[in-house]
From Swiss-Prot:
This is Cyclin-Y-like protein 1-B. One of its GO terms (biological process) is regulation of canonical Wnt signaling pathway. It comes from Xenopus laevis. Keywords: Cyclin. Residues 145-267 form the Cyclin N-terminal domain. Belongs to the cyclin family. Cyclin Y subfamily. The keyword Metal-binding does not apply. Pfam families: Cyclin_N. CDD domains: CYCLIN_CCNY_like. GO terms for cellular component: plasma membrane. Residues 1-69 are annotated as: Disordered. SMART domains: CYCLIN (SM00385). Residues 17-28 have a biased composition (Basic and acidic residues). GO terms for molecular function: protein kinase binding.
Length: 343
């Protein structure tokens, strides 16, 4: 009892010899057991999010995966923005009549674009402007054959030899993307996800978007985003009907390479999506692509509230459906109650 330690020793055996023998018998198996526990982790199923990436791959530097990393298109556009401001300052260019509207205590100006339901036309303009800055301020001309339009033309027209030397302007990129979105009836959210996949491809594959490959890279990103984001059946043959001269086999091969280069990482977290949306708005503000602002009225407030509730109910239904499909014993989010039988 208390601090007293007692032990029992066989009367016909020496205490010291017996103690040494028992220590020797128990010590070695115990050490072996410890070594086995340290070296054998046992059966363990690794989750896809726990995959080991190369040592030089820093997730925090990839804006398409990490919400705190700055988007590539916004950083590439800052060079031109600074040059425009410097040129206006040197040449004493007056901004002229102020067309930007500011809210006051009596009037609030809002546009019809929200993070949950962006304006389609304005979003496509901003996304294509981001692609334009990617091409204009690229670091080099690294590319892959699968995206080379000279090797895989989208039309029957012959591609000129100097095709890779002329950067497309913003209007050219906008017309190409707008045609695809109008024909396929895609949403504005799909345009934002397209830009996320595009920057993820450039980061993962270590390539640049340039005049020789921009159409096929954008087409592959739109194709993948439309299948992942939009809740509708999209087939590669649908895009072949829009782009008359491309074959289904070419579309399938490009999609397969695109997925492999993305390492099949098609996940877009909500925080990353929101970051791209607000950075696109900043890009629009820096380049005078302002959204159409209107005074907030009672009718507009009710409309915005209805849109928010509709999107909220939609996401709740999607999350409930996902929970029903993927619920498991180790992922219980609440207490599950069974119906009581009263007799």
């Amino acid at each position: 009892m208390g601090n007293t330690v007692t032990c029992c020793v066989s009367p016909d055996a020496s205490p010291k010899a017996g103690r040494d023998r028992r220590v020797a018998e128990r010590g070695e198996p115990y050490q072996t057991q410890v070594e086995l526990q340290e070296t054998d982790p046992g059966p363990h199923l690794q989750h896809i999010s726990d995959r080991d990436f190369p040592s030089d791959f820093n997730d925090e530097c990839n804006p398409s995966d990490h919400p705190q990393a700055s988007t590539i298109f916004l950083s590439k556009s800052q060079t031109d923005v600074r040059e425009k401001r410097k040129s206006n300052h040197i040449n004493h260019v007056s901004p002229g009549q102020l067309t930007k509207k500011y809210s006051s205590c009596s009037t609030i100006f809002l546009d019809d674009s929200t993070v949950s339901q962006p304006n389609l036309r304005s979003t496509i303009k901003c996304v294509t402007l981001a692609i334009y800055y990617h091409i204009k301020n690229r670091d080099s001309d690294r590319s892959l054959d699968i995206f080379d339009e000279k090797l895989h033309p989208l039309t029957r027209e012959e591609v000129t030899d100097d095709y890779c030397k002329h950067d497309p302007d913003h209007k050219h990129i906008y017309r190409f993307v707008r045609t695809l979105f109008s024909a396929a009836q895609l949403t504005a959210e799909c345009a934002i996800v397209t830009l996320v996949y595009l920057e993820r491809l450039l980061t993962y594959a270590e390539i640049d978007i340039c005049p020789s490959n921009w159409k096929r890279i954008v087409l592959g990103a739109i194709l993948l985003a439309s299948k992942v984001w939009d809740d509708q059946a999209v087939w590669n043959v649908d895009y072949c009907q829009i782009l008359k001269d491309i074959t289904v086999e070419d579309m399938n091969e490009m999609e397969r390479h695109f997925l492999e280069l993305l390492q099949f990482n098609i996940n877009v977290p909500a925080s990353v999506y929101a970051k791209y949306y607000f950075d696109l708005r900043s890009l629009a503000d820096d380049n005078n692509l302002s959204f159409l602002l209107e005074p907030l009225s009672k009718e507009r407030a009710q409309k915005l509230e209805a849109i928010s509730r509709l999107c909220e109910d939609k996401y709740k239904d999607l999350s409930k459906a996902a929970m029903r499909r993927s619920i498991s014993a180790d992922n219980l989010v609440g207490i599950r109650r069974s119906n009581a039988i009263i007799s």
